[in-house]
Structure formats: structure tokens, C-alpha cells
């Protein structure tokens, strides 16, 4: 396995697809990186030469990926929660943030059902 940006990317996949194993890189960004670094997207990772891998590493330095991106996203959520805006409060309460209904649905975001005792007659 080639190790790029601290991630072991699979050897048997095409470079274009293998780059998507890095957090923060999708197919479109992978294609952009490959064209900038002048690497053929159709070859397999195991067939890459050391020079090609080095080109990919230098091209990846221009993007925020992996741990830095995760930290940046976490800090953005924490900022929303600290300033007490609606989005931050909704994140804190594990409810949908973008205005979706919660009376029904929203089961994924709210988690498993919590049974509440019924009213006595």
C-alpha cells in the first residue's frame, strides 16, 4: 500500500479511486489533483513510480485534508455551539439543523426511540 497524507491507499485500485480514500478528497478533487500533477488516472497504485507519488503528495499539500479538515469542521461546530445560535443548539441537542420536521421522521438524527409513560386515565 502506498502511504499518502498519512493514509494507506489500496494498491489494486486505480489512482483516481484510491485517492478518494483520503478524507476530504472526492472523485472531482482527485481528478483535479491528477491533472495538476500530470499523473495518468487509469494506472493502478501499485504501478506508480516514486516520482509520481511525490508529485501527488506535493499536489495534496494545497488542500485541507484528513486531521486538519476534521479539526476545522469540529471547531466550526464548537463555535456555533459556543455563540448559542439556533444551529449550535440543534447540534447540541442532536436534532436536525436545517429546518426539517421532527414530530415524525428524523429518527436517524434523534437516535433510538425512548419510551415515555402514557397519561393515567
UniProtKB/Swiss-Prot annotation:
Bias type Basic residues, positions: 100-121
A UniProt-annotated Pfam family: Ribosomal_S13
Region (Disordered): 97-121
Matches recorded under NCBIfam families: uS13_bact
GO-annotated molecular function: rRNA binding; structural constituent of ribosome; tRNA binding
Entry protein name: Small ribosomal subunit protein uS13
Span of the signal peptide: none
Domain of life (superkingdom): Bacteria
Cited function: Located at the top of the head of the 30S subunit, it contacts several helices of the 16S rRNA. In the 70S ribosome it contacts the 23S rRNA (bridge B1a) and protein L5 of the 50S subunit (bridge B1b), connecting the 2 subunits; these bridges are implicated in subunit movement. Contacts the tRNAs in the A and P-sites.
Protein keywords: Ribonucleoprotein, Ribosomal protein, RNA-binding, rRNA-binding, tRNA-binding
Biological-process GO terms, alphabetical: translation
Quaternary data: Part of the 30S ribosomal subunit. Forms a loose heterodimer with protein S19. Forms two bridges to the 50S subunit in the 70S ribosome.
Coiled-coil blocks: none
The keyword Transport is annotated on this UniProt entry: no
Homology family: Belongs to the universal ribosomal protein uS13 family.
